[in-house]
C-alpha cells in the first residue's frame, strides 16, 4: 500500500513538472496580453496626441494650395519672350540659318550643285590676274606666270599708244594646255592663243554678244582692242612656250632655231618702220 502511494505521488510530481515546462515554453513563443504590443496600443500619449493628426497648420494651410502667385502666374506659361520670340527661330543675323551649309554662297547643302568657275571677261579678270590669282587646272588647262615688263611689237604708233593707255586693264598671263608630253612651239602657241581668247571672251565671238547699237558706237574702239590684245596674247604665248620648253627640257632643232631668229629679225624690222 505504501509503495502504491509513493508511485502515485511521483507520477503527480512528474505531470506537474511537464505541465510547468509546457506553459513556460508557450509563454515565451506567444506573449499574452501583457506584452509590449498590447501595452503599446493602450499607451495614452501616442494615438491621442493632439499635436500631430489634428495639426491645423498643415492640411489646411491657406498659403500653399491656394497660392495665387504660382499655378496661375501669368508671367510664366504665357511669357511672350520665349515660345513666340520672333528673333530666335528666324534670326536673320546668323549666316545660313535654316539653309544649311554652302561653301560659296551660304545656301543649303540640300541640292547643292558643284561649283563652276564663272565665265570671265578679259577686262574683268585684270585685277585678279595681276594680283597673282591661281586659276589653274580648269578642264586640263593651266595659267602661266605673270609676265610684267615685256616689250610688245605693234604695227602702228596708235597701237602702241592704245596699249600704253589701257594695259593696266588687262591681265598679264595666259592659259595653256597641260600636256602629258612635250609638244612643238606652233602647237603650244596655237592652243594657248585659242584657249586664252575663249576664256577672256575677246575677238569675233565677243562681238556677237554685244548689241548692234553698242557695236556701232564703239566699232573703232573694239577693233583696236581686238587687234592689240590678240597680238599681246600671241606674244605672251610665245614667251610662255619658252618657259615651258625650259621646264620640259626640250631642245630646239637647228632649223627651228634659225626660224626663230629670222622671225625675230623680221619683227624688229617691221617695228622700226
Swiss-Prot record:
Binding site residues for Cu(2+) 4: 90, 93
Protein origin, superkingdom: Eukaryota
Which organism is this protein's natural source?
A: Gallus gallus
- Output the lineage of the source organism: Eukaryota, Metazoa, Chordata, Craniata, Vertebrata
One cellular component term (GO) for this entry is:
basement membrane
The UniProt subunit note reads as follows: Monomer and homodimer. Has a tendency to aggregate into amyloid fibrils containing a cross-beta spine, formed by a steric zipper of superposed beta-strands. Soluble oligomers may represent an intermediate stage on the path to fibril formation. Copper binding may promote oligomerization.
Main localisation, per the record? Answer: membrane
Q: Where in the cell is it found?
A: Cell membrane
Name the membrane topology term: Lipid-anchor; GPI-anchor
Tell me the residue numbers annotated for binding Cu(2+) 3. 78
By its UniProt entry, which PROSITE patterns does this protein fall under?
Answer: PRION_1, PRION_2
Sorted alphabetically, which InterPro entries does this protein's record hold? Prion, Prion/Doppel_b-ribbon_dom_sf, Prion/Doppel_prot_b-ribbon_dom
One BP term from GO: protein homooligomerization
The protein's job, in short, is:
Its primary physiological function is unclear. Has cytoprotective activity against internal or environmental stresses. May play a role in neuronal development and synaptic plasticity. May be required for neuronal myelin sheath maintenance. May play a role in iron uptake and iron homeostasis. Soluble oligomers are toxic to cultured neuroblastoma cells and induce apoptosis (in vitro). Association with GPC1 (via its heparan sulfate chains) targets PRNP to lipid rafts. Also provides Cu(2+) or Zn(2+) for the ascorbate-mediated GPC1 deaminase degradation of its heparan sulfate side chains.
Q: Which protein is depicted? A: Major prion protein homolog
Q: Which residues form the signal peptide?
A: 1-24
Amino acid at each position: 500500500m505504501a509503495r502504491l502511494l509513493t508511485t502515485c505521488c511521483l507520477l503527480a510530481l512528474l505531470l506537474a513538472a511537464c505541465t510547468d515546462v509546457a506553459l513556460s515554453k508557450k509563454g515565451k513563443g506567444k506573449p499574452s496580453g501583457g506584452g509590449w504590443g498590447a501595452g503599446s496600443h493602450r499607451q495614452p500619449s501616442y494615438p491621442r496626441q493632439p499635436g500631430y493628426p489634428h495639426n491645423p497648420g498643415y492640411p489646411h494651410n491657406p498659403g500653399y494650395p491656394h497660392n495665387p502667385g504660382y499655378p496661375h502666374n501669368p508671367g510664366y506659361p504665357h511669357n511672350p519672350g520665349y515660345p513666340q520670340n520672333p528673333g530666335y527661330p528666324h534670326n536673320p543675323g546668323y549666316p545660313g540659318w535654316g539653309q544649311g551649309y554652302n561653301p560659296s554662297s551660304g545656301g543649303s547643302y540640300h541640292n547643292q550643285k558643284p561649283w563652276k568657275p564663272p565665265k570671265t571677261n578679259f577686262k574683268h579678270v585684270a585685277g585678279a590676274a595681276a594680283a597673282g590669282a591661281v586659276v589653274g587646272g580648269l578642264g586640263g588647262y593651266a595659267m602661266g606666270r605673270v609676265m610684267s615688263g615685256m616689250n610688245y611689237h605693234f604695227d602702228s604708233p596708235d597701237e602702241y599708244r592704245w596699249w600704253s593707255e589701257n594695259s593696266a586693264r588687262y591681265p598679264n598671263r595666259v592659259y595653256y594646255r597641260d600636256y602629258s608630253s612635250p609638244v612643238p612651239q606652233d602647237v603650244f602657241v596655237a592652243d594657248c592663243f585659242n584657249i586664252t581668247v575663249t576664256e577672256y571672251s575677246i575677238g569675233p565671238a565677243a562681238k556677237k554678244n554685244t548689241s548692234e547699237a553698242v557695236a556701232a558706237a564703239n566699232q573703232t574702239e573694239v577693233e583696236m582692242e581686238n587687234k592689240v590684245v590678240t597680238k599681246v596674247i600671241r606674244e605672251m604665248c610665245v614667251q610662255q612656250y619658252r618657259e615651258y620648253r625650259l621646264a620640259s627640257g626640250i631642245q630646239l632643232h637647228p632649223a627651228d632655231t634659225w626660224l626663230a631668229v629670222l622671225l625675230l629679225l623680221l619683227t624688229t624690222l617691221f617695228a622700226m618702220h
